[in-house]
Regions:
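Short beta-edge strand/loop motif at the mouth of beta-sheet-based domains
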Residues: 10-11, 30-67, 150-160
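Hydrophobic-ligand binding "helix-grip"
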Residues: 33, 47-106, 116
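Ser/Thr-centric signal marking residues that sit
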Residues: 27, 96, 109
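Terminal "cap-and-tail" regions of soluble proteins that handle hydrophobic small molecules
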Residues: 2-4, 66, 104-181
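Pocket-edge structural micro-motifs
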Residues: 13, 61, 87, 164, ...
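General beta-strand recognition
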Residues: 10, 21, 58, 82-84, ...
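Hydrophobic ligand-binding cavity/cleft-lining segments
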Residues: 1-41, 168, 172-181
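K/E-rich alpha-helical interaction surfaces of small helical-bundle regulatory domains
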Residues: 19-34, 73-80, 126-140
Length: 181
C-alpha cells in the first residue's frame, strides 16, 4: 500500500459508540445506505456485501440522473477492529485501497482511516472533502441507533448505552439546532 503523503488520505474520527456498532454501520448493507455517498447528495442502492477476505462488495450510488457503480474486494476483515478493502468506480481508472482501524477510546471508538492509490491530486482532494462529511453522517447514524433521531430496523442490542449519555444529549441539541435551520 503506497501511503506516502502525496498519495494518501489520513483521517481520524471519534464515534460515540463501541467498535462493534461502528463496524455494523461500516459493513451492514442496511446501515451503509444511511451514509454512503451522502457528501455529494447520492443515495446507495443494491448494496451487496460478502464480508470475508477475498469477498466483494458493490453498490449503485444514485443522485437524480447520475448513477455510479462502486465496488471492491475485502483484503482484511478483523471484526470489529480492522477492515481493509479496495474501492473502485466502475468505468474509471479510480482504484484505491481503504483501511479502517477501530480502536476503543473511552466510551467510544477512534477511527484511524487511510485511503491510498488516488489517480491524481484532484481525486484525493475530492475524497478529503467527502469523507469527513460521510463520517459525520455515520456518527449521526450511530446516535440514531441509540435512540436519537429516527430508529433503524433490526438494530444491534442497545447494551452499550451506558457511558454515551452525555454524547447523546449533545447530539439531541445539535439535531434540534439543525432541524430549526
Amino acid at each position: 500500500m503506497d501511503d506516502n503523503s502525496a498519495n494518501a488520505l489520513r483521517l481520524t474520527y471519534h464515534f460515540a459508540g463501541p467498535p462493534d456498532l461502528v463496524w455494523a454501520i461500516w459493513t451492514r448493507p442496511d446501515l451503509i445506505r444511511s451514509w454512503f455517498g451522502s457528501s455529494h447528495g447520492f443515495r446507495a442502492h443494491d448494496i451487496a456485501v460478502d464480508l470475508r477476505p477475498g469477498g466483494t462488495w458493490s453498490l449503485r450510488n444514485v443522485n437524480g440522473d447520475v448513477t455510479e457503480h462502486v465496488s471492491g474486494t475485502y483484503h482484511e476483515v478483523e471484526a470489529p477492529h480492522r477492515l481493509v478493502y479496495s474501492y473502485h468506480f466502475e468505468g474509471t481508472d479510480f482504484f484505491s485501497i481503504i483501511s479502517a482501524d477501530l480502536v476503543p477510546e473511552g466510551d467510544g471508538t477512534r477511527l484511524h482511516f487511510l485511503q491510498t492509490g488516488f489517480p491524481d491530486a484532484q481525486a484525493r482532494v475530492e475524497h478529503a472533502q467527502g469523507w469527513p462529511h460521510a463520517l459525520r453522517v455515520m456518527g449521526d447514524a450511530l446516535l440514531a441507533m441509540h435512540g436519537v433521531g429516527m430508529l433503524w430496523p433490526a438494530l444491534p442490542e442497545k447494551t452499550h448505552l451506558d457511558g454515551v449519555a452525555r454524547d447523546l444529549e449533545a447530539a439531541r441539541e445539535r439535531l434540534a439546532r439543525e432541524a430549526a435551520q
